[in-house]
UniProtKB/Swiss-Prot annotation:
Species in which this protein is naturally found: Haemophilus influenzae (strain PittGG)
Protein EC: 4.1.1.31
Cellular component, GO, one term: cytosol
Family: Belongs to the PEPCase type 1 family.
InterPro entries attached to this UniProt entry: PEP_COase (IPR021135), PEP_COase_bac/pln-type (IPR022805), PEP_COase_Lys_AS (IPR018129), PEPCASE_His_AS (IPR033129), Pyrv/PenolPyrv_kinase-like_dom (IPR015813)
Any GO BP: tricarboxylic acid cycle
Gene transcribed to yield this protein: ppc
Protein's UniProt name: Phosphoenolpyruvate carboxylase
Functional summary from the UniProt entry: Forms oxaloacetate, a four-carbon dicarboxylic acid source for the tricarboxylic acid cycle.
GO molecular function, one term: magnesium ion binding
The UniProt record lists the keyword Transferase: no
Reaction(s) this enzyme catalyzes, per UniProt: oxaloacetate + phosphate = phosphoenolpyruvate + hydrogencarbonate
C-alpha cells in the first residue's frame, strides 16, 4: 500500500470514528452498537461469509421503524465523508508529490518537446484553447447546499491536518472543529423539505462560481502561463480567454414549466447583481494595494494628474460598482431604480479598459510584479465571467416553436403551419425572415403557451449582445426547427444575431444531423447571418436511452465526424457542444479519455460541454479540484489537436456498424420489445418513489401519463443505479462484442482496444460500470418487490450481465475488474461495505412503502429518501 493510499484510509477511518462519536452522543450506545453490528456483517458478507450475509438480511429485514432513520443516516453520512476524503486526496500535497499525472499539461508539453513538435504550432494551438463549461441544474445533485458548505469546511480541516509540524494543541483544535462539523451535519436534515425553484437552482450555481471558480480560474490561468513560459519561452496575452462559463440555470425551459420568461429575467438580474458584488469586493482590495505614485505619460493624459493615479481610477470603478449593485438590487426587489443606467457598469469593457490601462502603466513603470498580482487576477475574471457572471443559454423543445408559429399562421389565415411539408415550412420561414414587415398582428392575443415563448424571446431582446450565449433547440429534427427560432427572435425585436443551436439527441436524429445541417447551409439567408460560425449540440442522454450505450456512442461519433467534414468543406467554423452527464448511460467518462476518444479535428475550435448536477461539485466544488479539472480539459484539448487520435480503419468502422446494430436490437428488444419490461422496471427499482425526492425544479417526465419513453434520461438511469443492475450503461454492448468475437473477428476487436481511443474508452467505461454493479443485490430487489411471474426478466438480465463481465475481462486479459486501476477497485470495495446495507434497507423500505401506499409511516418515507441519497453518494453518480 502506498503512503498516499495509507493516508487516505487513515483520514476515512478518522472521519468514521468522529461520526461514531457523534451518533453515540446523539442516539445512544444501543443504536451505535446496532450500526456497528450491521457494518461488520456487511464486511464479512462481502468477504464471502454466507452466515453473515443471511444475518445481515435478517437484521435489516426486521429493523424497527424507530431505528431505520438513524441506521440509514449513519451509512449515508459515512459515504459522504468518504467522498470528502477522496476528493481531498486528489489535491493533497502528498498526492502532488507522489505523482505527476501523465494527463497534466506539463507532462503533455514534455512529450511535445520530446517529439520535436513545432513551437509555432503549439503556440498557435494554445492561443486558440477554449474550455467552455455550461453549468446545468439537472436534478442529480442529491446533497443539500447546507451540507455541501459543511463538507467544504471538513475538506479544509483535512488540508490543515496534512501539515506535519503541527503541535499537539494545534492538532486537537483542528480535530475538535472536525468533530463539530460532523455533528452539525448529523443534526441537519439531509433531505430537502421542498423542491427547489429554478431561482434557487440558479443561486446554487452562482454560489459555486463565487466559492470555487472565482478563485480557480485565475489560478489555472497563472498555471497555464507558467507552463507555456517554461516550455515555450513566452507569456500568454493578458486578454486571452481560454476559460468561459455559461449556464442553463434560469434558461433551460425544456420540459420545465417553472422556468418562465419572468424567472429568466430575474436570474439575469441576479447574475449581474452577484457579479457587481464580487467585482466590488475585488476592486475594494485593489484600491488598498495600488498606492503607487508613478504612472506612464499615456495614463496621465487619459485620466488626469493625481497623487495616487491608480487609486483614482480604481475608486471611480468602486463607485460605479456600488451604484450597479444598488440598481440591480432595486430591480430584484421590484423597486424603481435609484440610479440611472448611465451611472452603472453594464458592459465588460467599462471594467476592462481602465484596469488594463493600470496594468500596462505599471508594466511600463517597472512594476511588473505588482501588475501581475491581484490586478491580473481581476482582468482574468473579467475575461472569463464578465459583468454578467456567466452567459446564459436558452433551451426549449422544438415542437413548442412549431406550435407557436402554427397558432400565428392559423390566426392570419394561412392554415396550420405544423401540418405543412418541410419544403413549404422552409419557404415560408425564409420569406418571413427576409421580409421587413412584421408577421405578428398587433392586437392578437396568443394562447398562454405561445405567449410564454414570445415573452422569452422579448426578454432576450432586452439584453445586450453576448448576455445570451445561444438558443438551444432540443429534439431538433429539421432545418425548419432552426429557422423557426430565428423568426420568433426577429418578430420579438431581437436586434442582433444569436447562435441558434440544434440539439440532435435520438439515434435517428444523430444519423440525420449531416443532412439537416446541409439543408440549412444551403439557405442563402442563413449563411448570410451565421458569419461562417455554427454550433451543434450532441445529446448523449436521450440517444443512450433510445438505443443503448454502444449504438448511441457510435452514432454520436459518426455525427460529429460528418459535421466536421461538412463544415470544413464549406469553410464554416464548427463548435460541437457536448450534452454529457456524469454517468456512463449519459455519456460520462473521465474527462481526458472522453475527449481523446472523439473524432480527429472535432476539438479544433475548443470544447463546450455541460457540467451537470453532482458532477459540478465533484469536479469544480473546490478551487484546487477545479484547477485540476481545467488542467485535464486543457491538456486533452491540446493533445487532441496537436497529437490527434488515429482515423478509424475501414474494418474498425465495419465492426462498429455491426456492434451498433446488434447492441441496439438487443437493447430495444428488452426495453421496448418485452411487454413485461415496464412493470418489471417499475417494481424492481425505486423509479416511482424517486419522484417524491425534491431534487430539482424539473418534473421527472416530459409527459406525466407516458411510459419509459417519456421518462427523462436522468431518473431512468438514477433508478437502475439504485438497484445496482446499472442496466442503461451496458445492456446490449457486451453481448454484441461476444457475437462479433464468435464470428471469428476477435483479433480485430483486440486491435481496436489497443489502438483506437474511442473503442478502448468504451471498454474502460463498461469495466467501471460492471465494478459498481451487483447481481446479488439486484436479486434481492426482485425477490422482495417483483411479482414471481416477472422474475424471469431479472434472471435473464443478470445472466447477461455476468456473461458481459467475462467478455470484457477476456479483452483486458485480466482475472478481475479494474486490475489496472487498483486505487479505484479498492475505493469501490470500501464503499460496498457501507452501500450494501443501504441497498438492503432500501429493499425493505420499498416493501413497507408499497404495502400500504395510502398510509405510509413518515419514518419509512424519510428513511427511503435517505437510502436513495446515500446510494447515490456511494456510487458517486446519480444521473
Amino acid at each position: 500500500m502506498t503512503q498516499e493510499y495509507s493516508t487516505l484510509r487513515n483520514n476515512i477511518s478518522m472521519l468514521g470514528r468522529f461520526l461514531g462519536e457523534t451518533i453515540n452522543d446523539a442516539q445512544g450506545e444501543d443504536i451505535l452498537e446496532l450500526i456497528e453490528n450491521i457494518r461488520k456483517l456487511s464486511r464479512n458478507s462481502r468477504a464471502g461469509d454466507d452466515k453473515a450475509r443471511q444475518a445481515l438480511l435478517d437484521t435489516l429485514g426486521s429493523i424497527s421503524n424507530e431505528n431505520i432513520i438513524p441506521v440509514a443516516r449513519a451509512f449515508s453520512q459515512f459515504l459522504n465523508l468518504t467522498n470528502i476524503a477522496e476528493q481531498y486526496q486528489t489535491i493533497s500535497r502528498e498526492h502532488s508529490l507522489a505523482q505527476s499525472s501523465s494527463q497534466s499539461l506539463s507532462e503533455l508539453f514534455k512529450r511535445l518537446k520530446e517529439q520535436n513538435a513545432s513551437v509555432e504550432e503549439v503556440h498557435k494551438t494554445v492561443e486558440k484553447l477554449l474550455i467552455e463549461l455550461v453549468l446545468t441544474a439537472h436534478p442529480t445533485e442529491t446533497t443539500r447546499r447546507s451540507l455541501i458548505h459543511k463538507h467544504i469546511e471538513i475538506n479544509k480541516c483535512l488540508s490543515k491536518l496534512e501539515h506535519h509540524d503541527l503541535t499537539e494543541k494545534e492538532r486537537n483544535i483542528i480535530e475538535r472543529l472536525l468533530l463539530r462539523l460532523i455533528a452539525e451535519a448529523w443534526h441537519t436534515n439531509e433531505i430537502r423539505t421542498v423542491r427547489p425553484t429554478p431561482f434557487d437552482e440558479a443561486k446554487w450555481g452562482f454560489a459555486m462560481l463565487e466559492n470555487s471558480l472565482w478563485q480557480a480560474v485565475p489560478e489555472f490561468l497563472r498555471q497555464l502561463n507558467e507552463t507555456t513560459r517554461e516550455f515555450l519561452g513566452y507569456d500568454l496575452p493578458v486578454g486571452l480567454k481560454p476559460v468561459r462559463i455559461s449556464s442553463w440555470m434560469g434558461g433551460d425551459r425544456d420540459g420545465n414549466p417553472f422556468v418562465t420568461a419572468q424567472i429568466t429575467k430575474k436570474v439575469l438580474y441576479f447574475a449581474r447583481w452577484k457579479a457587481a458584488d464580487l467585482f466590488l469586493q475585488d476592486i475594494s482590495k485593489l484600491a488598498d494595494e495600488l498606492s503607487m505614485m508613478k504612472c506612464s505619460d499615456e495614463f496621465r493624459d487619459k485620466y488626469g494628474e493625481h497623487l495616487e493615479p491608480y487609486r483614482f481610477v480604481v475608486k471611480n470603478l468602486r463607485n460605479q460598482l456600488t451604484a450597479t449593485l444598488a440598481y440591480f438590487d432595486d430591480h430584484l426587489s421590484n423597486r424603481t431604480p435609484r440610479v440611472s443606467e448611465s451611472e452603472i457598469i453594464l458592459e465588460d469593457n467599462q471594467l476592462w479598459e481602465p484596469l488594463y490601462d493600470c496594468y500596462q502603466s505599471l508594466i511600463q513603470c517597472g512594476m511588473r510584479i505588482i501588475a501581475n498580482g491581484s490586478l491580473l487576477d481581476i482582468l482574468h475574471r473579467i475575461s472569463c465571467f464578465g459583468v454578467t457572471l456567466s452567459q446564459m443559454d436558452i433551451r426549449q423543445e422544438s415542437t413548442r416553436h412549431t406550435d407557436a408559429i402554427a397558432e400565428i399562421t392559423r390566426y392570419i389565415g394561412l392554415g396550420d403551419y405544423s401540418q405543412w411539408m418541410e419544403d413549404d415550412k422552409q419557404a415560408f420561414l425564409i420569406r418571413e425572415l427576409s421580409s421587413r414587415r412584421p408577421l405578428i398582428p398587433q392586437n392578437w392575443t396568443p394562447s398562454p403557451e405561445t405567449k410564454e415563448i414570445l415573452d422569452t424571446c422579448k426578454v432576450i431582446a432586452q439584453q445586450k449582445q453576448g448576455v445570451i450565449a445561444c438558443y438551444v433547440i432540443s429534439m431538433a429534427r429539421s432545418a425548419s426547427d432552426v429557422l423557426a427560432v430565428h423568426l420568433l427572435l426577429k418578430e420579438s425585436g431581437v436586434p442582433y444575431h444569436i447562435p441558434v443551436v440544434p440539439l440532435f439527441e435520438t439515434l435517428e436524429d444523430l444519423d440525420a444531423a449531416e443532412k439537416v445541417m446541409t439543408q440549412l447551409f444551403n439557405v442563402g439567408w442563413y449563411r448570410g447571418v451565421i458569419n461562417n460560425r455554427q454550433m451543434v449540440m450532441i445529446g448523449y442522454s436521450d440517444s443512450a436511452k433510445d438505443a443503448g450505450m454502444m449504438a448511441a456512442s457510435w452514432a454520436q461519433y459518426r455525427a460529429q465526424e460528418a459535421l466536421v467534414n461538412l463544415t470544413e468543406k464549406l469553410g464554416i467554423e464548427l463548435t460541437l457542444f457536448h450534452g454529457r452527464g456524469g454517468t456512463i448511460g449519459r455519456g460520462g467518462a473521465p474527462a481526458h479519455a472522453a475527449l481523446l476518444s472523439q473524432p480527429p479535428r472535432s476539438l479544433k475550435n475548443g470544447l463546450r460541454v455541460t457540467e451537470q448536477g453532482e458532477m459540478i461539485r465533484f469536479k469544480l466544488g473546490l478551487p484546487a479540484v477545479a484547477v485540476e479539472t481545467f488542467d485535464l480539459y486543457a491538456s486533452a484539448i491540446l493533445e487532441a489537436n496537436l497529437l490527434p487520435p488515429p482515423e478509424p480503419k475501414p474494418e474498425w468502422r465495419t465492426i462498429m456498424d455491426e456492434l451498433s446494430t446488434i447492441s441496439c436490437d438487443i437493447y430495444r428488444g428488452v426495453v421496448r420489445g418485452d411487454k413485461d419490461f415496464v412493470p418489471y422496471f417499475r417494481s424492481a427499482t425505486p423509479e416511482q418513489e424517486l419522484s417524491k425526492l425534491p431534487l430539482g425544479s424539473r418534473p421527472a417526465k416530459r409527459n406525466p401519463n407516458g411510459g419509459v419513453e417519456s421518462l427523462r434520461a436522468i431518473p431512468w438511469i438514477f433508478a437502475w443505479m439504485q438497484n445496482r443492475l446499472m442496466l442503461p450503461a451496458w445492456l446490449g454492448a457486451g453481448a454484441a462484442i461476444r457475437q462479433i468475437i464468435e464470428q471469428g473477428k476477435g483479433d480485430i476487436i483486440h486491435k481496436m482496444c489497443e489502438n483506437w481511443p474511442f473503442f478502448s474508452t468504451r471498454i474502460g467505461m463498461l469495466e467501471m460500470v460492471f465494478s459498481k454493479s451487483d447481481t446479488w443485490l439486484s436479486q434481492q430487489y426482485d425477490q422482495r418487490l417483483v411479482k414471481k411471474e416477472l422474475w424471469y426478466l431479472g434472471e435473464n438480465l443478470r445472466k447477461q450481465l455476468e456473461d458481459d463481465i467475462q467478455t470484457v475481462l477476456s479483452l483486458s486479459h485480466q482475472s478481475k475488474l479494474m486490475s489496472d486501476l487498483p486505487w479505484i477497485a479498492d475505493s469501490i470495495a470500501l464503499r460496498n461495505i457501507y452501500t450494501d446495507p443501504l441497498n438492503l434497507l432500501q429493499v425493505e423500505l420499498l416493501h413497507r412503502f408499497r404495502e400500504n401506499p395510502e398510509q405510509v409511516n413518515p419514518d419509512v418515507e424519510q428513511a427511503l429518501m435517505i437510502t436513495i441519497t446515500g446510494i447515490a453518494a456511494g456510487m458517486r453518480n446519480t444521473g
